[in-house]
Every structure is written in C-alpha cells, then in structure tokens.
Amino acid sequence: EPLPLNLPLHQAEVAAVKAAEPVEAEPVVITAIPKDAMVMEAGQVKSGSTRFLNGSWRAMLEVTDPITGKPPYVRYQIQNNKGTARVVHGKNVVCRATVFSGLHSNGELMIKTRGNARCADGSRYPMPEITCKAGTNDVAECSARYDAKTVVPLTFRKAGA
C-alpha cells in the first residue's frame, strides 16, 4: 500500500542536550613512606647492591619476651653485608651476634647469623634468619624465621633517622 503524500506537520520542539553526569574521580591515594623505613631501591636490587642496608637499624619483631611480655629490643649495624646484631631481652640481658647479608638472584634480601647470639650472662639467644622483599613503593617487607614452624613479621626502622 503506498504511503499517503500528505504527512502530518507539527511544530518542532527543541530538546535540551542533557549534560553528562559528572563522574566522581577516585582519589589517588599516595601512601607516604615513613622516612625511617627500609627502602629496597629497585636499581640497587637489580644490580645486586645492598647499599640500602648500610647503617644502623632497629628491628621491630612481632614476638614477646616471656619474662617482660614486651618484644626484645633488636638493633642491627650493617656495612657492606657484614655487621652485628645487638639484642636486649628479659631483665636487660644484652646479647650480640655477627650477621651477614646478601641478595638472592630473585631480589630477596637475606640477613643471617652464624648460630645464636652470645649473651652477657653466659646464655645464648636464638637469632632468626631474616628475609625481605620489596613491597609497595619498594618498602621492605620482612619476616624473621626462627625455625620451620616459627616465622614472624618484622619491620626495620632506620635508627637515628
């Protein structure tokens, strides 16, 4: 059937263009790196350098001393992958151990001691094997392994920063 030749005519209406709804931009969260955090600088790690480790570090261990109920005070002094660890635990018993460190080819930092720390009172204090890898913003994420079953989180803070 042919279409009618007289189309209905109406006054045209102007439709306002709808403005696009403003989309809330997700705020970019830039986490501040604590100035005393251990930063495993990517370039150094790639080249096998542990310069970022040189200096004095306070290790914050998530363990408690059975005598005081507080974590032991552990301080590492490291220069060119060699150094000492000083532990104060219990009723101010001071222990020392020789430490050495290095980078694995996978970029993990290892900090080890040869045996337990020797203490001023003649006792020995177990020292963990520490493993760190670069996390968010290259801040070191570390864990302290005392034995196959005991692994605790550990945070390094630059001493005197």
Language-model segment annotations:
Residues 1-52, 159-161:
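Amphipathic/hydrophobic helical signal segments and adjacent flexible N-terminal regions
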Residues 28, 39, 97-108, 137-161:
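Edge beta-strand at a domain terminus
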Residues 36-69, 142-143:
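Tryptophan-anchored aromatic micro-motifs
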Residues 63, 67-108, 142-145:
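N-terminal glycine/threonine-rich, aromatic-flanked beta-hairpin/loop signature
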Residues 64, 118, 147-149:
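Short glycine/acidic-enriched loop and turn motifs that connect beta-strands
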Residues 67, 116, 126-128, 151-161:
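N-terminal localization leaders that direct proteins to membranes or organelles
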Residues 74-80, 128-135, 154-156:
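Broad, structure-driven detector of short, well-ordered beta-strand segments within folded domains
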Residues 88-139:
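Contiguous, well-ordered beta-strand patches that form the walls/edges
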